[in-house]
């Protein structure tokens, strides 16, 4: 699933390509992709003749502010497992997994391509609170790049939780936008084993973890995100972070720090990658080796 860096990469690309451009029409090829409104015709009518004022990101959600002479509405997108937003000329052949097409001037269009069909798109009418339609937004924790994401904030989210830190980091009510890839990477950078219980973490470890989360996300955004399966940016280009990942998807390969084989285990049904030499239950003493 695309995580914060991949969604941020898409947001930046959309702002470069679609800003101030008017949506001239739309075509929905798979009705269930449209989460709201329930009428596909109402969705197409709602977005037509609206210009893209800007694209925002909240966690893994993309939100386009749509402006018309009389009102402001919103377009929401969640890529889920395999969703892609691709900026293409209208003459480009349709991919068989194309679900929604948004038409713009100069024969350009924005296509939502989604192999697994889990992705969703919303149109929020003028005067309606975005969170009342895209209800997942109200459950999101602070964004890692927001001022709210302090050591104290993260500590308050983790304290008294008797579950593994890796599992907690995947909870969008703990950290918005983090997923399997960057949870593994941040835990390696902070020297903490994924099975460590949240309740056992010291404040110093949480401080290191917060810093590591921000660092790995920034590094991945600079690399254009990670492509292990389906992710592409709006121009159809792969992300490059996978080539420099510390542990994710590297089971059996030598650790980039100590040379020991990277291990993989299952936690709450998800794969977790780590180095048993560089990561410990306490974690703090190993941190300096990755700076």
From Swiss-Prot:
A zinc finger (FPG-type) spans 246-280. SUPFAM superfamilies: Glucocorticoid receptor-like (DNA-binding domain), N-terminal domain of MutM-like DNA repair proteins, S13-like H2TH domain. DNA binds at residues 97, 116, 161. Transmembrane segments: none annotated. GO terms for biological process: base-excision repair. The keyword DNA repair applies. It comes from the Bacteria. Binds 1 zinc ion per subunit. Belongs to the FPG family. PANTHER family: FORMAMIDOPYRIMIDINE-DNA GLYCOSYLASE (PTHR22993:SF9). This is Formamidopyrimidine-DNA glycosylase. The lineage of its organism: Bacteria, Bacillati, Cyanobacteriota, Cyanophyceae, Nostocales. The gene is mutM.
